[in-house]
Amino acid sequence: MITDASIDRIAAREAASFRAANPKSLTLAQQASTNWFQGVPFHWMLDWPSPAPLVAAHAQGAVLTTVDGRKLDDFCLGDTASMFGHSPKPLADAIAKQAGEGLSYMLPTEKGVELGEMLARMFGLPRWQVTTTASEANRAVIRWCRGITGRKKILIFNGCYHGAVDDVFVDLRPHPSGWESKMRASLIGQVHDILPTTSVIEFNDLEALESTLKRGDIACVLAEPVMTNVGMVRDAPGYLDALRRLCSETGTMLVFDETHTISSGYGGHSNAFGPKPDMMVIGKSIGGGISTAVYGFSDEIAERMAKLNASRPSGHSGIGTTLSANALAIAAMHAMVGKVITHDAYRHMLELARRLVKGIESVIETHRLPWHVVNVGARVEFVCADRPSTNGSEARAAMHPKLEAAIHLYLANRGILLAPFHNMMLLSPATQEGQVDRLVHILDAAVTEFLE
């Protein structure tokens, strides 16, 4: 049994070891606090469970090097942005070439024409638009769906995350009479009440899904085909097919945010396993770390969008930014989709994912831990609970933040970098078997110590 006392003891020791091993990172963190708010250029960088964030010097493939000269096997990979490896050569070459030719014209390019064709082939949807982030893509998709359906409401799943999109920050919370929808309490500066226009239900709850959609007032269902931001929650058998059917029957747009679930296979989860959405969003890794994203849709949806666009008064649509589809972003995606995100890359990634899952399951079995492993293709997590979650509420309850943080720091001190959010791990085309085996070996050593 792993006790709180054991967790506290090891966490304190590992924090001291971190300070001793990373003096330059700590010095730079102190220096940065003079000008950067809370010492970092972006406050999420404080989410790492270490005394201070490691300061990166450079990264290549699946190895990150810090300013202290420490090399870490990187399974975080920029929290998916570099899921296909840090600075793959085709991407680096494309960025360098474009840097000498202009970065943003607010004009289309020849590579952009080719990219549209490549996206259609890869993801199976014929029409596309580019944004600067997946958050922006999701905001755009919500606007388009509301516009073409004439409906105000959207439906999301409890525990979801679709970026910095106001409309999705609604949760189900316990109430004396059962459950109630509440705006997320952690939001900063939230003014508008989004509860009247955002419905939320539990993932895999077919009865709630059917009753909500049959009201006929939902513009779109915005969902990951597998939930990945509240831990990982797999779809129950038949649930996604029922979702597709009900959306079609009720005139509701089905939107899959595949920013994370592109880990499932070539063309994303919906192409690997179905069903096909009306619209799809892909961000982060599609640009290999360059800030860009895309959303795709069917010809029928495109016709409805065009009619809406032609019928509205002149003026800003509320969709898009000046830097959307800039030449650098187009060049980056052209290189990634054309030369990096390949069938061969997925074969390697998925094979390593199976190896990692098997290794962690062996650790769990050896130590008789009440844990389990879940994966979405090349995305893997071990969960400190005895059974897989079926919805967001169960996934939240399964989390053990203090233990997860202590394990994360233990591994980081020994050259293994996991994501700071529920210890997610990604396998890239550059990841090697030895890195996977080393992770499993060090996790086994960690568990042995925590059980003492």
Label each PLM-derived region with a short phrase.
Residues 1-452:
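Conserved N-terminal phosphate-binding loop of PLP-dependent enzymes in the Aspartate aminotransferase
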